[in-house]
């Protein structure tokens, strides 16, 4: 199952602008002609400079990056947990996401009204947080009597019950579950919204992007969660231009090192607990997505289940060693290519060829 990141935000925060930029930036359309994508799903390539360099060494015909899926979740309003706006539908869509990306408005623009009449990022963040906490409170309050009943017949459920009660206490105090010591594995079946990792995207205008003091204030608002600063309107203009000199000149002019969408894709990938390994050959150079901590056979299974079933060993060289030596042949001669067995835990940037027997 693809892990997705749900994008949420109050009306007029710039969520749709950001999402449209994400969907225009559509690696899937180019590489997977048969993929049908829901209209509210944006699939974004994870930028990785290693791929182009590998493709050069192997003279690969094409390059396929890892991808992250973002899901556009219809606007949240105050009272969503009571069923206001698209309330309940909204909350069930977030439940399906593995992480939540909240777009928060920082830009001031007389022509774009703010739902509360004033631009106040701190208030916006707590409005959404409050709705998610209220929704979780309802879930936990409903679950506790059921868990109490189950625990009477099955002692193993006692730990889940205790964790649910602990979560309830924190939620009543207004604390998201992710910011507590509650064992998230024990409350996983409840699909609590505030147990998901959060990424905050602050939608700024050009001047604000250069204002380090403002950015520090915003970071402090959401720490320890990741904060990303971008101008959604500028990002969608960049995507229109594609990868050309004009786009690079625009970035330079803004004093930004790389597009905000690239940062968002990378942070999203990391927040989902994912990493990549690389395969390369004349046909393609490709980044494959695996959970951090995956073993070599599990990694092989991402290419094809037969690879996992018939796994014998993996021939592995680190990307850095391969680049330093220039070719696979030289890496082998220098003793940098290793044979790893089924207990090997994959490292980020391993360049791999699997040996299997079906």
Question: What is each residue range found by the language model?
Answer:
Residues 24, 56, 92, 130, ...:
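Short, intrinsically disordered, mixed-charge
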Residues 30-31, 112-116, 212-214, 241:
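Short amphipathic alpha-helical segments
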């Amino acid at each position: 199952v693809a892990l997705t990141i749900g994008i949420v935000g109050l009306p007029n925060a710039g969520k749709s602008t950001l999402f449209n930029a994400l969907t225009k930036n559509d690696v899937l359309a180019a590489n997977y002609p048969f993929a049908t994508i829901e209209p509210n799903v944006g699939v974004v390539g994870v930028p990785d400079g290693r791929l182009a360099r590998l493709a050069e060494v192997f003279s690969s015909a094409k390059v396929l990056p890892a991808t992250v899926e973002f899901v556009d979740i219809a606007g949240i309003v105050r009272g969503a947990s009571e069923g206001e706006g698209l309330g309940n539908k909204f909350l069930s869509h977030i439940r399906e996401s593995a992480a939540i990306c909240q777009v928060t408005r920082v830009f001031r623009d007389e022509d774009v009204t703010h739902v509360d009449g004033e631009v106040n990022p701190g208030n916006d963040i707590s409005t959404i947080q409050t709705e998610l906490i209220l929704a979780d409170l309802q879930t936990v309050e409903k679950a506790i009597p059921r868990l109490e009943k189950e625990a009477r017949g099955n002692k193993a459920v006692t730990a889940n019950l205790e964790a649910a009660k602990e979560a309830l206490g924190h939620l009543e105090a207004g604390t998201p579950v992710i910011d507590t010591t509650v064992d998230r594995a024990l409350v996983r079946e409840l699909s609590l919204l505030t147990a998901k990792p959060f990424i905050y995207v602050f939608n700024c205008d050009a001047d604000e992007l250069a204002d380090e003091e403002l950015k520090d204030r915003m970071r402090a608002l959401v720490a320890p969660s990741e904060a990303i600063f971008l101008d959604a309107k500028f990002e969608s203009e960049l995507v229109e231009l594609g990868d050309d000199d004009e786009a690079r000149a625009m970035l330079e002019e803004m004093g930004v090192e790389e597009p905000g969408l690239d940062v968002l894709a990378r942070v999203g990938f990391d927040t989902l607990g994912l990493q990549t390994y690389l395969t390369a050959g004349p046909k393609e150079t490709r980044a494959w997505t695996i959970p951090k901590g995956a073993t070599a056979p599990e990694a092989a299974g991402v290419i094809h289940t037969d690879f996992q079933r018939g796994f014998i060993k993996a021939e592995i060289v680190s990307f850095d060693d391969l680049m330093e030596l220039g070719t696979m042949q030289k890496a082998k001669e220098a003793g940098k290519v290793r044979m790893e067995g089924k207990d090997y835990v994959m490292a980020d940037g391993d360049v791999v060829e699997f040996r299997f027997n079906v």
